[in-house]
From Swiss-Prot:
This is 5'-nucleotidase SurE. One of its GO terms (cellular component) is cytoplasm. Its EC number is 3.1.3.5. The gene is surE. It is found in: Cytoplasm.
Amino acid sequence: MNELKKPHILVCNDDGIEGEGIHVLAASMKKIGRVTVVAPAEPHSGMSHAMTLGVPLRIKEYQRNNRFFGYTVSGTPVDCIKVALSHILDDKPDILVSGINYGSNTATNTLYSGTVAAALEGAIQGITSLAFSLATYEHADFTYAGKFARKLAKKVLQQGIPADTILSVNIPNVPESEIAGVLSTSQGRSRWEENAIERNDMYGNPYYWLNGTLKLLDDSLRQDEYAVRRNYVTVTPLSCDLTNHTFLDSLNQWNLQK
């Protein structure tokens, strides 16, 4: 296939340009299209949809093994998408893929995720967008995740997804032979039970490390976090529209004008 006829794929993440997951994802996407990598210069996990205001953003080329790999932006994942579209890319991408994140982005974690936010920013800009996350924080093996990401990206390029919608994909950190299956799921319900650890600096002033445990509030295989814990790959459609449409009709009956 002529290089210019291949789909143009924008690759981003929130773990930063040196994160292993983005290198696996970029390599996988290069098998099906033209890849441009634009990622934060430093890790920005948990930044959600934050963007940089009042501070200049800087773009730099990034070398990997003495070869050009992509661009870094001195900002958040959302900054990367905005800057890529306005100052780096010559043509609009056919698809945006974000990840592969180090750690799951299911249930409540979806709201904190810079990986998911980068994909949502892509959708806001009218780009078909996917987010990929590996459900582990240690001993990560991105092999199957990269393979599945490529398979799903090809399917999405063929089938399309609705406007203002992304697919958030969470992949168990197990060998392919142990994957239980692939499920389309909804965003699960959970909350973090916080345990802020207090310590003192050398001057005796207290400081805090945020810590906690994710408490699952449902136990259905149609919810992403529960399914991932049982070795299912989950594919969850998320919308840029945060409106609770179910409650909106009831709210209209409140007669708020009086």
